[in-house]
Amino acid sequence: MSASALDAFFGARLADTDPDLFAALEKEFHRQEDGIELIASENIVSAAVLEAQGSVLTNKYAEGYPGKRYYGGCAAVDIAEQLAIDRAKQLFGCEFANVQPHSGAQANGAVFFALAKPGDTILGMSLAAGGHLTHGAAPTVSGKWFNAVQYGVRKEDGLLDYEELEALAREHKPKIIIAGGSAYPRFIDFPRIRKVADEVGAYFMVDMAHFAGLVAAGIYPSPLPHAHVVTTTTHKTLRGPRGGMILTNDLELGKKFNTAVFPGLQGGPLMHVIAAKAVAFGEALKPDFKTYQQSVANNAKVLASTLVERGLAIVSGGTDTHLMLVDLRPKNVTGKATDESLGRAHITTNKNAIPFDPQKPAVTSGIRLGTPAGTSRGFGEAEFREIGLMIDRVVEGLSKAGENGSNEAVEQEVGAEVKALCKRFPLYRNH
């Protein structure tokens, strides 16, 4: 390469080298800054986390674990990964952490790979009741490789049906019992599930991907004293980069999990992401993280109560966490139509099935809402009450217009208010 080509390679900005992609990134930045993000699994990371992810560590291959790599030149990345491991252990008060999984699904897959064989029985919460795809849903690897038995929630109150879980465990004698999910808003009784796991000889696994940040802050009961193994994502409430992690207090199981991650499921770890995990865990160890998580929980309660006041129903009657599942049937609108209408008003949500949903999965009777991203940008209880009223106006307008009618006037009015609110809480000051 010529000197000028090298200068461009190492010094040119993305806006100059790839304007089409740069335009897409700018479009996404303004979508995030000018709109209200209520998807419960999304958050806004710090500038420091972004910096770590965009660092030179993206250039480094590092198969293996700190001090035991299959490549040379790993001294610096060993430091980064060990920081992530040590901080994760300190944050959750556990003896072992594997920070290499590329996602929560990979973390769950590694646990299954370590503890079960194809054809074994696993017991998890059904997707329809608020569980996660990776806990045995039919289209997934866990649903195809294992005999996946599913428990749910009670029809009368939307709360986890512990009696059904216990009966299924005693009947099927699963190898693994899984707790946690993607749309269950209440505390889970971990000691009760561990008791039945011990009774039937099962491993007890908790997927705390959604509420890990609340656990770290002491707001949600920790599963670590009760579960054989805990998995999580590192984004969502934990407010780190997109990735996964495995935690346990059993060092012998930890050895199995290490082998299951590498070489079992993955090759080279993403060292730039692991460095960003270390940054996020360091942030979570600071006192203001607990304040943030308490605000996340308080804001969720305010949002839920505001919606209930306006005639909407919340599955299980409320929330103990950062998320809630809104039952739209009282307004005779679908999750799909509501999600799309809110989106045009610059409020991002996701349509979500409610327990015992009569609608098809692509339509749904509900939407799922969460407060982590809004809280990260500075929204407090007053703002979330305002957001709840905005949502109600969009839903009410949609209800009056009918599924095929136009809600454009309401969407435009609310959209202008959303932009005015967001302007008071800008993102990334140096963008």
UniProtKB/Swiss-Prot annotation:
One cellular component (GO) term of this entry: cytosol
Protein's UniProt keywords contain Transferase: yes
A GO molecular-function descriptor: glycine hydroxymethyltransferase activity
Source species of the chain: Granulibacter bethesdensis (strain ATCC BAA-1260 / CGDNIH1)
Subcellular location as annotated: Cytoplasm
Protein name (Swiss-Prot/TrEMBL): Serine hydroxymethyltransferase
InterPro entries tied to this protein: PyrdxlP-dep_Trfase (IPR015424), PyrdxlP-dep_Trfase_major (IPR015421), PyrdxlP-dep_Trfase_small (IPR015422), Ser_HO-MeTrfase (IPR001085), Ser_HO-MeTrfase-like (IPR049943), Ser_HO-MeTrfase_PLP_BS (IPR019798), SHMT-like_dom (IPR039429)
Keyword Amino-acid biosynthesis attributed: yes
Lineage of origin: Bacteria, Pseudomonadati, Pseudomonadota, Alphaproteobacteria, Acetobacterales
CDD domains with a match to the protein in the record: SHMT
